Amino acid sequence: MLEQDAQVTDAELADAVAAEEAAMEELLVRLVETETTLGNEEPGQIVMREAFADAGLEPRDLPLDTDAIRGSIYSSPFSWDVSGKANVVADLPTAGSTGRSLVLNGHVDVVGPASEQLWRTPPFRAVRDGDWIYGRGAGDMKAGLAAIVGAVRGLRRLGLSPLAPVQLQSVVEEECTGNGALQCVLSERRRDAAIVTEPFPAAITLAQVGVLWFHVDIAGSPAHVGEAGEGVNAIEAAYRLLSGLHALEAELNDDPPSPFDTFEHPINLNVGVVRGGDWPSTVAAECSLSCRVALYPGTPVVELQQRVEETVAAAASTHPYLSAHPPHVRYDGFACEGTTVSADEPLVQTLGGAWERLTGTAPEHAATTATTDARAFIQHGIPAVCIGPHAESIHGVDERVLWPSVVQTAQVLALFIRDWCGLAG
């Protein structure tokens, strides 16, 4: 095999990837129909091991190492057991060492379907309707994993190998901590760039917010409902705290920095889970709120944690019972800062060029009010961006992905690998 660039055109690469469309769709269907919510990721990783092997690669596991993760300043706290969880990675055979190395990353885990009764089709059954494929995780982000595999299958079809290391990663825990991608960064050799195929169509993400999950435990005083005035309802007391937290949210949105000043409301507080009480005829003795709030790049997580704690304490001080029995704030899940990448990065320029040549239109440079695993690479000095298929209703009802955009993403990745790494055959 010659250590030189193969003379392969954009059209030849795109056609080779398109020839793998059936295999990509089959993989996406299998992934969607394999439930991979938190704690149930392994069945999806079995599918990804098989997909990597079917593409001619040798998959290997990267188990989550609790001590290594918790020892990193970039980890998010977690209270659950991660033993037995593993990322799955595969390295492309190389034809030389003259190019730039690369990671192609996607996450296999998904959020739950919420109320299945609201879905037009069962959430864990992949249903194609015209150019759309429905199902939980179809867009976020199992289609991105299918695109990664499709790009590699296209290269293998042409008998081409990169002139630098290229690693494919299927990671866990993107939806709750980001510790899966962090484990890859901690365990594997440094790469020159990373692309995460999150569903950001026709846009390269250069900035993303950080995210903080926090939980507020509120103690009330139980009583028989016939003597409700003798007790303190913890659920009702929670309203006082929520009012204060939404006031904090408004403050955080007062003067957003660029590029988040293009959003009407870039910092979103979400009360995602409320648990409280144990009996309809008993004044609720306890209530817990599980919340998510965002933070701008440059804001330390500890600074936002302090503001949350001060806000909860201030709101509690105005309540006759909570002022003497203050709520407790704890952290479990996301605790990550925002990140940015320069538009002048060679990664951004090269990826934009590949997209424009394939589609005829230059991709936008975008910011997102969510967080992604690109963060783990950026925090370790590895330029990383997101670009991927067109998806709708992610985390919502009737999530779906536009199938032609999945094929297009795979084609762009193949062109990018040629431009970034070089190819030989």
Model-identified regions with their sequence ranges:
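Short, conserved micro-motifs enriched in small and acidic residues
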Residues: D131-A146, G159, V232-E236, R400-V407
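Active-site catalytic microenvironments for nucleophilic, acid-base chemistry
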Residues: T34, A151-L158, G244, L248, ...
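Acidic/histidine-rich catalytic neighborhood of metal-dependent amide-processing enzymes
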Residues: I133, G139-W213, C421-G425
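Acidic/His- and Gly-rich active-site-bordering loop/insert found
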Residues: L2-I133, R157, P162
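Metal-dependent amide/peptide-bond hydrolase catalytic core
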Residues: M1-E12, D54, L206, W213-G425
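Hydrophobic/aromatic beta-strand patches that form the interior of the parallel beta-sheet core
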Residues: R60, L102-L104, A193-I195, F214, ...
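Short beta-strand segments
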Residues: N105-G106, S170, I195-E198, D217-A219, ...
